[in-house]
Amino acid sequence: MPLAKAFEKKYGVKVELWRALSDKVVQRAVTEAQAKRHAVDVVETNGPELEMLTREKLTSEFYSPYIADLPAFALPPHRQWVSDRMNFFVVGYNTSKVRREELPATYEGFLDPRWKGRLGIEATDAEWMATLIKVWGVERGMNFFRKLSEMKPDVRKGHILLAELVAAGEIHVGLTTYNSNAESMKRRGGPIDWAPVEPVVARPQGIAVMKNAPHPNAALLFADFVLSPEGQELFSSLGRVPASLKVASTLNNFKYTLVDPATVLDESEKWEKIWNELFLKK
């Protein structure tokens, strides 16, 4: 991970990195805490998952001089984690299979029969569905998702995997692609691009220092580095969207609806039940 390598080079502090899907990150942190094994210093993952760790009382109150550079939404009232970057749910498409001008202006355009057998979604994106329904209203929103279910999109777990399958041409269009994943693959020469089809849903990603971090000073130093202009510029260079207002990005110049991680968590049972019925129990 370039961010970890840059930190090691600057401070001479060795970083041991473990990467996994967000649910696995939470599972490991909770399991180890229950076993009184405190091996994790810092967690960087999705906002709702950080909210889960906060409610499990595994994180510590967060302070950094770089919080002043962040938008108001980046720091929850409890200060147990802070947003360091953003993820946007966009339409990723294989440039060998789909021309940009073919893409509809809104998600409802993908209900056209010509897209059947060409669409993919990520298996855990109930919050994307919930946000579209809130934006559109229940009747219009549920009508869309029932019809989308009938299109039988290819459901895959993992946003990186979804983007990889789009780039490989196995899935022509990923409806819930993270623009950061598509952008990084595009910059490496992959046949993939993305478009902010409305309505675009945005979710904060964040970083938390664990309450029982075995190396608390190094953990705080790493968190500061991630939030610093240097760390945020590095995010930007990798095709990520930094949270800092001091670092410009060309990857968020469109209208979007921001989800609140605490609300996502509070309503997760309701929306996941609907999502599972529509897309996972097939």
Question: PLM ranges: what are they?
Answer:
Residues 1-13, 253:
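The catalytic Nudix box helix
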Residues 3, 13, 140, 144-147, ...:
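Short amphipathic alpha-helical coupling segments at ligand-binding clamshell hinges
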Residues 69-73, 87, 115-124, 146-149, 153-156, 226-247, ...:
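Periplasmic-binding protein-like
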Residues 1-4, 16-26, 30, 38-170:
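Extracytoplasmic ligand-binding site segments that recognize negatively charged/polar headgroups
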